[in-house]
Amino acid sequence: MKKLLLILLCLLTGCAATYDGPTTVEPRLTEYTLDQYYVFLDGEVDHDVKRTVYAYDIHGNRVREMDYSDDRLFSVTKMRFDDRGNMIESITWDHSGWLPKFSRRVTKTFDDQNRLLTQDYYDFWGRKTSSSTYTYDDQERTRTWCSDDGDSQITWYDEQDNELRQVAGEYETVYEYDDRGNMTGWQSFEQGKPTDSYRARYDDRDRIIWGGRYDPAGELESETTYTYDDALGTKSYDTYDGGRTVEHYHADGRLHMIEDFDADGRLVFLHRYYYQDIQVPVKEGTS
């Protein structure tokens, strides 16, 4: 009986494999909830709750996501990984009807440097609906993405793997960084002519404190100021629609709550993140 229960537990959590090497304890996100609030014309307030539960295998890979809406199971996604931790397959089942049904499958392949090579999508009938391929030039430090419908994009990187430039057809974006690796801005072009641009500033702890978006004439269209409260562990900023967002962090930097307020100061969205410590293999090169 105990053996049967163990088998069932492994099937549910994706932990059928075994691992006998050294392990350590790391926090993993195990549950996420979203409360959405509605205010009616008569002033009455209502809200619904969406929840996602995550499960991991003994290697620390996220192998299952279960989505709930008002405590009713909505969808289940199962992931499969190779022995290097790359997610090579994702299958989603829709549980919103009377019977669960397959809704989407994604497969991926990687090279020996764990770089994505192909990504294929399949529909309910198992037919491939779209496909993408990625090629790399280590000497030129580029990555080229091509879709099966003829679209393509090439990206250039620096030695720290920061994106320097992207070209997709007649569109181009150029990125800038400071000497600490913070992205300080980007400039977009269409057919060689400047379009939108963005600029950012950071504090001495590499935290963004201001970001501004500019129109093609160089006029400031919108800006966001970020403030931090180290005692409370919060990061706050205004949103484009006049609202305000407050992010809450644990002492170790893990995000545990986000509050989104509208222009009238009413709470609209409440995001909460829950973690559990799980045993995972010790990464190579660490003790």
Residue ranges and their predicted role:
Residues T18-S287:
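Buried hydrophobic residues that stabilize the cores of well-folded domains
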Residues L12-G14:
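C-terminal motif of bacterial Sec signal peptides marking the signal peptidase cleavage site
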Residues M1-L4:
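Positively charged n-region of N-terminal signal peptides that target proteins for export
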Residues L6-L9:
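Sec-dependent N-terminal signal peptides
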